[in-house]
Amino acid sequence: MKIAIGCDHIVTDTKIAVSDFLKAKGYEILDVGTYDFTRTHYPIFGKKVGEAVMSNQADLGICICGTGVGITNAVNKVPGIRSALVRDMTTALYAKEELNANVIGFGGKITGEFLICDIAAAFIEAHYHPTEDNEQLIEKINQVEKQHPEQQDAHFFDEFLDKWQRGVYHD
């Protein structure tokens, strides 16, 4: 199984630790960045994880930023992605087994590294339990999605990257 993983600059070390843990368990990892601690913007990497999953470059995805809120919201904007921000095993398993989540999000400054590793492994190993109710709920969620063609523009995030460089945003 191949797992796409992405993060912002605040939690690169956590992403590397989770990647190494999953590799040791035998999973193939597609690391979409960021790769260092140079200031960047989390939506870029949420989008990359979501696109990797939806293009079948990866089976599932993991997103990590400081709180997990921003990157999980960003990945959920990719059509077809069902991501859940989790901090505990129960929520992660519910997301996968009941809602067929294909990406999981974490706050690397909120949830400890070892717990993230354990939750990620359980999420990956869990299986969706299709029921009529689950299928109907997922279909309702899918109906909310809308395609936004401007997101395909290679310069879609330039405005935000420029603001990072000018110091508008702060960690």
Curated annotation (Swiss-Prot):
GO molecular function: galactose-6-phosphate isomerase activity; ribose-5-phosphate isomerase activity
Name of the protein described by the UniProt record: Galactose-6-phosphate isomerase subunit LacB
Entry keywords, A to Z: Isomerase, Lactose metabolism
SUPFAM superfamilies hit by this protein: Ribose/Galactose isomerase RpiB/AlsB (SSF89623)
Enzyme class, broadest EC rank: isomerase
Keyword Isomerase: yes
Catalytic reaction list: aldehydo-D-galactose 6-phosphate = keto-D-tagatose 6-phosphate
EC number: 5.3.1.26
Keyword Transmembrane helix: no
UniProt xrefs under PANTHER family: DNA DAMAGE-REPAIR_TOLERATION PROTEIN DRT102, RIBOSE-5-PHOSPHATE ISOMERASE B
Subunit field text: Heteromultimeric protein consisting of LacA and LacB.
Organism encoding this protein: Enterococcus faecalis (strain ATCC 700802 / V583)
GO biological process: D-allose catabolic process; galactose catabolic process; lactose catabolic process via tagatose-6-phosphate; pentose-phosphate shunt, non-oxidative branch
Metabolic or biological pathway: Carbohydrate metabolism; D-galactose 6-phosphate degradation; D-tagatose 6-phosphate from D-galactose 6-phosphate: step 1/1
Family: Belongs to the LacAB/RpiB family.
